[in-house]
């Protein structure tokens, strides 16, 4: 037909069999990619340290989505939570990946069958014998089936009635595991961080959708509405489908970037706002203060802080710190975290306790400044030593460690104090292995950042696609023009293929 690359989809217009074929092939590609990507991630994933080397530090993209649905165990005998497992069966990471690949193969064969056997009786109007699709009826069927799935997911999978539940954790991402979730039917169900809302909203949306599906199967649209919305044109379906997809993409951008019950920090990493607001820092300090109030010594109080919680309070885990053009997982940046060194507390020779001012998210470099409890600058690492008044050496700063690997150690020499002051600027202090992965020391973003960036871009592109195809279908008669030689009343947009022979035309005299 000599079509340019951007017009090739013309071949499936008015060809229901091949329209089904290309959709089957598309679903085959999606399922095949999901299964193959999962197997690739499982091949490169290191499950040995779920606390300091979790999946989001390793750049896993598919695995977090599997885990939040309750797939956490591997045929290799390990679990994402760090436990040993035996015989996880089909409901395992490898099992789900392989079922997607098998599904992909079956869809591939179905696509070929429908491409070859495209001219089925099913696709012909029994009154006219012409190829035709009853699009409002098809809409009702799709709505009913998808709503049944939606209802089933909320009522059975998430609640644990017939399924594993979903990933549930505390507000600080320390105790997460897969649990059955009871639906939340009150105002608390609208809290985006409440897993109960996932169950209740899927049940509610599924119920409404089932009723709407039955309605669209039993009630025909009025003729004026049918014509006004071009319900007989397949491009109307394309336009409205694109709108549903871009709207969903925008919503998931928000739930991913700002965080929600469906994007737990144990699986996708912390959000940038948790660093900006000092979310984990405040919780750690609160726990330490409570422990000291109960009679614990500072070193004991800090030793009670889980490494997992301390690791969240580190700027390298902030998804906004990685540049969009720095490819690779977080571990390729600052390295593989090996140990929490502890919490450094600095003191000047006057006995004042000092803390290092933390680096804001959008700074690559930031002055190392030590302030007292009143926020007054008492020490720094100067840019120009000749003019310094508050240098570590001049002020006589020492560093004492509480908790972690260096618990109880005190550093008096200026080089060591400076080293730990620079590290404290980035949050809690950790030891990293940068040799194994040849990490370059430049921060990378987490899968949370990549997901948001990708979906925001695609949502924007699909938004314009919706406008384009919506305009084409609504204004088809305007764009096409009404030719004087057409002697038959036709629905514009119904015959758009090159070489169309079905519209009666009067030859030029």
From Swiss-Prot:
GO terms for molecular function: chlorophyll binding; electron transporter, transferring electrons within the cyclic electron transport pathway of photosynthesis activity. Signal peptide: none annotated. GO terms for biological process: photosynthetic electron transport in photosystem II. It is a multi-pass membrane protein. Keywords: Chlorophyll, Chloroplast, Chromophore, Membrane, Photosynthesis, Photosystem II, Plastid, Thylakoid, Transmembrane, Transmembrane helix. It is found in: Plastid, Chloroplast thylakoid membrane. Belongs to the PsbB/PsbC family. PsbB subfamily. This is Photosystem II CP47 reaction center protein.
